[in-house]
């Protein structure tokens, strides 16, 4: 009887955590990424929202039909300014600064930035569609000196975590306003 009660508590607690973290997940997958003519560095990607494929262009809104949670994905924005994506040290430093100083969730909206040079061919990034959960995850990454955001495999993370990547969250007042280059 005690075992049943223990399992029941674990299931309820797990459901509470899942609800608290937003419930929905979306995955950015780089395997089908191709060049785009939209802008010199723009790219397109595939995104899965709860296993439903969605095609991404330079600026795409992802909306969960059964909730008010929403994400805007902005591809190929280099961080920091005037730093090439090949400059891993400067790139990581800029990412950490922006995560620490600039990211602000707006209600249930999350903004993502990224560059195709960051995700390896077979890597993908899955994040909860929840500003609070995303903020905590990004802040924990930014404060971990052993886990740089270059997308390299040098960062050792538990098997339950996703590979490192350079995609970060970024708040903007308007979805039409792209970050300054």
Swiss-Prot record:
Location within or outside the cell: Membrane; Host cytoplasm
KO phenotype (gene knockout): No visible phenotype in a 12 hour, calf ligated ileal loop infection model. No bacterial growth phenotype; bacteria no longer induce IL-10 induction in human B cell lines. Bacteria grow slightly less well in human cell lines 24 hours post-infection. Deletion leads to greatly decreased phosphorylation of STAT3 in infected human cells. In mouse infections (C57BL/6 and CBA/J mice) deletion mutant bacteria are less virulent and less competitive with wild-type bacteria, mice have a reduced bacterial burden following intraperitoneal or oral infection, while mouse STAT3 is less phosphorylated.
Principal location listed in the UniProt entry: membrane
Induction description: Expressed during normal cell growth and in bacteria growing in a human cell line (at protein level). Transcription activated by SlyA, which is dependent on PhoP.
Membrane topology: Single-pass membrane protein
Superkingdom: Bacteria
Entry annotated with the keyword Membrane: yes
Entry's transmembrane regions: 4-24
Any one of the GO CC terms: host cell cytoplasm
Key words of the record: Host cytoplasm, Membrane, Transmembrane, Transmembrane helix, Virulence
Further facts: Encoded by the Gifsy-1 prophage. Also called pagJ, but this gene name had been previously given to a different gene (AC O30647).
Function: A Salmonella strain-specific effector that induces a host STAT3-dependent anti-inflammatory pathway. In bacteria-infected host cells (human) leads to phosphorylation of host STAT3, at least on 'Tyr-705' and interleukin-10 (IL-10, IL10) production; expressing the gene alone in host cells induces STAT3 phosphorylation and IL-10 production. IL-10 production requires STAT3 in infected cells. Contributes to virulence in mouse infection models. Encoded in only a few S.typhimurium serovars, it may be a specific effector for adaptation to bovine hosts.
Assembly and interaction partners: Interacts with host (human) STAT3.
Designated name of the protein: Salmonella anti-inflammatory response activator
Species of the source: Salmonella typhimurium (strain 14028s / SGSC 2262)
